Design a protein with these regions (language model features):
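Pocket-edge structural micro-motifs
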Residues: 13, 65, 138
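Acidic, glycine-rich flexible loop/linker segments
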Residues: 103-174
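Feature captures the catalytic cores and cofactor-binding loops of soluble hydro-lyases/lyases
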Residues: 20-22, 27-131
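Short hydrophobic "helix-edge" motifs at membrane interfaces and signal-peptide entry regions
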Residues: 4, 61, 149-151
Length: 174
């Protein structure tokens, strides 16, 4: 993962739950061939924006209001964000379980109160994960953001908790 993430904003409102992100009808709970995640991708966010998967430009950033990711624990609700092509989610507030699940797969999800008022759909933003700043390129407005913990960053930069454990195992046994 890059230290500076830049991308086009796709914006959603408050209370985007895991049923909206990954509709239950698309989840078979067990397909190991990857077809399940593709099915989830085709229906992600369709309750609010039918055909949303066709709109997303790879490398984009999702911005949302309060309570992003609330609801049931679904691995697909986090993995589908990567499958759609997002590099980052930023919301006014994020459900703790959703954020932890995202970190576990190496996907950054940031809580930035007020972000939904700062950017609009289609804006381009830069998020500097070294200096912990966020800039809206439309008007150059820049704000400081709360850094993630060292362990969260380590997990994300490793590509997820499993990859971090593999790295740690190799270091311990070589």
């Amino acid at each position: 993962m890059e230290k500076i993430i830049s991308g086009k904003v796709y914006k959603f409102g408050n209370n985007i739950d895991t049923d909206i992100i990954s509709p239950g009808m698309t989840i078979s709970f067990g397909l190991a061939d990857g077809s399940e995640l593709e099915e989830v991708r085709l229906h992600a966010f369709e309750e609010l924006r039918p055909g949303f998967y066709k709109e997303v430009i790879p490398g984009s950033i999702m911005v949302a209001g309060k309570n992003f990711g609330l609801g049931s624990h679904r691995e697909q609700a986090t993995t589908v964000m990567k499958k759609l092509g997002f590099t980052l989610v930023i919301a006014d507030s994020v459900a703790r379980l959703y954020q932890r699940n995202s970190f576990a797969i190496g996907f950054p999800v940031l809580e930035v109160p007020g972000i939904s008022r700062m950017v609009e759909e289609g804006d381009y933003i830069d998020v500097d994960l070294y200096n912990w700043t966020l800039m809206n390129k439309k008007n150059n407005e820049t704000i400081k953001i709360e850094p993630l913990s060292e362990i969260a960053l380590k997990i994300i930069y490793s590509g997820g908790i499993i990859e971090l454990l593999k790295e740690t195992w190799k270091q311990m046994h070589h």
